[in-house]
Structures are given as structure tokens and as C-alpha cells.
Amino acid sequence: ETEAGYDRSMDNSRMLLWPLYITSFCLWDSLQHNDWHGAQQVLVISASSKTSIGLAYALAADADAPASVGLTSKKNQQWVKSLGLYDNIVNYDALEDIDASLHSVIVDMSGNSKLLADIHAHLGDNLLHCLNVGLTHWSASGSDTGIPDQKREFFFAPSHIQMRLKEWGAEEFDKKSSQFIYDSAKKSADWMAIEKLDGVAELAEIYTDVCEGKLTPERALVIELS
């Protein structure tokens, strides 16, 4: 049975973005549920990743959210700026541009332990909390960040979903999350370039670039298998 309001034209976006933007929704919901952990700014590491962009949509739409700061590579800085979602954008080579006088919460999609350690050193006691989410910098991952255990947590979206299902019920959770995901996916059509690849052979041609992070952030790949 087709779901109510099903839009077939969104099939590719559904495959690409639904699993990511549900995490974005849960991150925003967790942050606001915890009163932003007392932060005055939300630092989003790997700001060009699609899960980060989903979170940025949620933060931009929330009048009560603290300022958002997108951290990204120098090569992606202008592209991230063009999205118009983050209040400020800082590249990894200019961490001193982060306002260290503000209480801060980190949402880390990168898993880059050195980067986290450098940000922690810059912010000092004004780093109040760190949510570890992803591994976009998987080759630089590690545990030596200097951030105390009591200030960091591994964010697992399914656990947050289970909490909200108990509190809200399935219907209310689906209503809130689905509307956010659909609206954000629609907006993403303005920048996302979907590319269809024919089978495993074409996937193999680009697989190394995917692993090495060489794809530009607007690209989104759909592999068609016959």
C-alpha cells in the first residue's frame, strides 16, 4: 500500500537523504531537548556533509537555536557559504576564527581526533559538550581528543528515536520527522546533483574517489543494478 502523499518524483532523494536527514532531525531534537547543553553556539564539524546540512536546515528554522558555525575544508568553504544556512563558516586551517569566549557544543561528523583536540584546546572550559556522530575523516579517527568523558557522548539516532516513540507515540514522531525530512529534501534539490551509475562496473570506477573524499559535496550517487 502506498503511503499517504507519496511523491514518486522524490524517489532518488528518498534513497539518498531520508537515512541521513532522520539523523539530522534527531540531532536537532536532542540538542533542543537538552537546552543546547547550555551553549551559545553549535559547532558543526564537516559542515558540507549531507547530515550536517540537514542539521543546519533545522537550526536555521529554529528561532530559539544558538548561532551555528560550520567547520569545513578550505576547498569547500565557499560552497558551504553559498548554502546560506550557517551563521558563520570557519575552515580547518583557521580555528582561531571560532569565538572562544562563547559556551559551545560540538556536533562532530568527522571523527578527526586531532581536529577535535585542537578545537578543545582553543575553546578550553567553554567547550561544554561534544556529540560524536560520524567518521567523514575516517583515516584520522582516534580517541585522543583531550575532551573529558563527561563532556562527550556517542550519538546513536535509533536510541533517540526509541525514546521519542515512547514519549510521543509512533504517529506523532512520524508526523514531525517526516515533515522535516520531506521539506529539507525539497530544499536540497537546489544544490544536490544526483548522478546515476549503471551497475557495479561504473561504481568501481569512482569507488576510490568516494573512499578518498574526492567527491565534491553537491554530488550524490545512485547505483542502478539490473
Predicted regions and their residues:
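Terminal helix/beta-alpha structural elements that buttress the NAD(P)+-binding lobe
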Residues: 1-226
